[in-house]
Amino acid sequence: SKEPDRLFGLRRMDRAALAVLRAMLTKTGDGTVFPLEGGAFLKSRAEVEYPDLQIHFYPGVPATTGVRVPFQKTPPGVHDGYGYGGTICQLRPESRGEIRLRSADPFASPVIRANYLSTETDRLTMRAGFKIMRDILQQQAFAKFNGHEYMPGPQVQSDSDIDAYIAANANTVYHPVGTCRMGMDEQSVVDGQLRVRGVEGLRISDASIMPTLVSANTNAPTIMIAEKTADMILRGAA
């Protein structure tokens, strides 16, 4: 970016700490504002019935480029300038991962295999989202801010190069669902009352019971699930 971005100074840990302290004490300053202030729900292509992409805009350089340590030189390879950018989230991925027991030890961490981007539809959708985001950031409204594209860089143009960049950099946004999915089949963990099959007196009430992802953030649906579960339990107790 040619002009300062609001979050540039907060990449220094001491300044970030002061911003949080100011927010706690005075309810003012950058620490009071969630950085992802702009976003949208979009269709990756015209034939999609309803939005399958969510994008976020952030007024700063992403943390993956590094944190600036106070009073030290910026490490090699870390972007040390103003910037802004965006992220693309696929709302309804077809790829399915798995969680397996590592051993009979109940304290052993499970084996988690996310299996991201394992279907052609997922790769096509993310590629379309990448192109949409790049097009948005190249609009005339950004002209006075535009410097140069730092990530991934203007050399990434072909579909194969875009796919390779996405595969190397894609990550979770921590909205997983479905590990204890609700359903009527034998592979479902809970029934329609969210009771765990084969276990007496146990229910699950969180995002893990969703059979598929909703086309939005998962926090509001999870609150709804909890409220519904409370109603079912109270009705049963009455």
Outline where the language-model segments fall.
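Extracytoplasmic/periplasmic, Sec-exported soluble proteins
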Residues: 121, 154-157
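C-terminal structured subdomain/cap of oxidoreductase catalytic cores
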Residues: 1-5, 9, 42-45, 83-144, ...
